[in-house]
Amino acid sequence: MALRQALSIAIDMEEFVSIFRNGRGIAAQSPLPPGIYGYRDGEAGIDHYVYDWVDGHPQRKPVEYAKQLLREVGYPNGIDATTGKPLTLYLDTTLVGPEAKSRADWFTKQLRKIDVQLVVRATDLNRFQDKLRDGTAQLYVLGWNADYPDPENFMFLLHGPQSRARGAGENASNYANPEFDRLFEQMRNMENGPQRLQIIDRMIEIVQRDAPWAFGFHPADYNLAHGWVHNLKPNTMANNELKYERIDPLLRERRRNEWNKPVYGPLLALVLLGLGAIAPAWVAWRRRERHRVAVQQDGNKS
């Protein structure tokens, strides 16, 4: 437990979001994202095993505290006190390419802060899925898009009976805690209310303490839309938003006419510029013509 807490402290998701997401996201404090019933903002919602509340904001606990946790469980300076061997962990990933290499290097750097060695193992998707089913994957990175906006659809990912290795469920970490499982069964079909919220609070507290996940981040995306587009509420859960959107064609046409009025200034400037370039040539041509006519007339007189 202390080892997992130390890893959670070391993996600085605020830095990850800043580097790889250009700041578009917030570090997760629990399995529940903002907007889902049971999510708590502010000091009430932070993971107190990973963060301190400082000046009105969550602040990740220092690396030295994570190292202290490792010493308490027998890994001083990342060395197994019993065998004398360095603590080495393995991260399985299916990502390839330059960005994947950058992310792998970043994870390696995070664990190096607490003197833990990380070996990144690239693998194909089928082999990766086999490792999850067999329970042989040690560290991995997964995300989740909910099927519906209810805390049950997030908490079930940690429900013991739905273990990937033992029951072919979605609990890929194979986490099992009897109290959590019992509370999940109570909570899953309850109506939202004080009793359900109390149960959810306790479930989150258990998961934060046990740290089966090093919580990642909740993505934040930005969308731009014209004023004539209505019923637009982008989210990361639904993929059928278009059926609800409405276009105001009259407003669209009015805006197009306002924004696309003819602008004659540049055209007039271009015409004047062209005339300015042609005028000297035309004057020179007229002079040559007059001279030619004068010469021709003098020849006829003689």
Predicted feature residues:
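Periplasmic binding protein-like
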Residues: 91, 110-163, 199
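Alpha-helical transmembrane segments
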Residues: 273-287
